[in-house]
Amino acid sequence: PALDSTVATYIAEATKFLYMGNPPIQFGVVPGVIKPETIAVIRGKVEAKDGSPLAGVAIRIYDHPEFGATLSPEDGGFDMVVNGGTLLTVDYQKAGRLPAQRQLDVPWRDYVTAPDVTMIAVDTKVSTLALDASVMQVHQGTTVNDEDGPRAAALLIPAGTSAAMKLPDGSTQPLSSLNIRSTEFTVGDNGPETMPGDLPAATGFTYAVEYSVDAALAAGADKVEFSQPIPTYVENFVGFPVGSQVPAGSYDRKQARWVPEANGRVIKILGATGGVADVDVTGDDLADTGTALDEIGMTTAERETLATLYAAGTELWRVLVGHFSAWDYNYPYGPKDDACRASQCGQPTPRPRPKDRKNKGPKDCNEKGSIIECQSQVLGEEIDLAGTPMRLAYRSNRVPGRHAAYEMDIRLSGLDPLPQSLESILLEVRIGGRLFQQTFAPANDLVETFVWDGKDVYGRTLFGAQPAKVRIGYAYTPQYYATKDSFEASFNRFGSAPIFFARSGGGGG
């Protein structure tokens, strides 16, 4: 709907059609729950793995049923009205797709853009396993391949293992057989958008996988729990040192966060003797036995199975999982030593003020017949209409095509030397629910002139002064850091010395 041009535009009035329309786009909102003083609008987009828009995704705010829900339309975009001033978790669900969550710091009386989300279907390769088997059973997922190389998740279910799914009401239901799938999130360029939840800031984007059981997904179970740890494997496609720890975490959708789990280990298959794999778990390129294997819980039955699955020379990550859900195997990461934030380096050198300039800015002049608004750069005039109580008013900011009030110069770098490791400079401007993004090559004394057309995200002209938020970012290629041996659970813990550059595709946080 069009906006009233005679008054300044406020977000509460501009967006009430979303949840008060007939019918409303956002349905199930408790009457009166949206407060004009704290209102905010979350905007986002949902896509399929191939980048096409995904319609019909149910979008809610986790643990806030009073805000109702909305469905993504044909273009995959959505708007959701909430009360801001806090952290909120956006929950995405669609039948046949793995669910996703994203946490946002939502302001008052403003729009906030959620990162794009990619929702994927479960792996088509399924293994049906009976839990009363007397031998170790194996599931191997579909082999995936991208610029980092091929890999496939493998799970080895020990004999005598029992399992039960934990339902949303807290009850458990035993399972006698399992239709197991392993679905990797971290494949291809849009891997970060596919993640089940936001990674912690210090955790590198490396490898994440959903271990699932069909019956549990159909029942909406929180997880599937096992009576003993399940060894999981994936090729060492990034090249971490043999013998090093593999930080692991699982995603708890009830808490909407990653939970640190026990570290795994990078191992190497050296060969096989008598049908049993010779395995190096310490990094000395020698077959380990006894205590070294006992410390990580590797049994003879597991080594017999490894001998049938992997050739000599294969390096693997091995992680024990006690339950099925989304798991993340990731090292800590960060930028190189010379890196800095945009607010810490490369900022403009302060310039001295002219001697005749006062600290206070010019005041607006609003005398009758002569209106000069210096701060907003507006010229105005008013003329009495004879015989009426009204006046004819003119304001230069209302003239079609005027851009002076819609422009601002944004300084991206100063005169000081920039870091050698700086890859690019990023600029974001948010105004009227719209997000404008630009990327620049590193350069000194860089200034960009931003021009706004005065319209909001729905294509309507806004009236009155509107808040704009500007963010400047310095982007670097991150590098992995080795974990400390003293950490039993290294997930989301800062590391020590650098190992090498991290995977492309971005990081968490």
Question: What do these predicted regions represent?
Answer:
Residues P1-F17, F27-P31, Q103-P150, L167-G220, ...:
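Long, compositionally biased, intrinsically disordered segments
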Residues T9, Y62-H64, N83-V112, T118-I120:
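A short, solvent-exposed loop/turn motif at the edges and junctions
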Residues G32-A55, F237, S413-L418:
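Structural motif
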Residues T38-I42, A153, Q228-I230, A404-I410:
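Structural beta-strand segments of beta-rich domains
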Residues P53-V57, I61-N83:
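Short, acidic Ser/Thr/Gly-rich low-complexity loop/linker segments typical of extracellular
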Residues K223-P241:
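Surface-exposed beta-strand/loop patches in extracellular or lumenal glycoproteins
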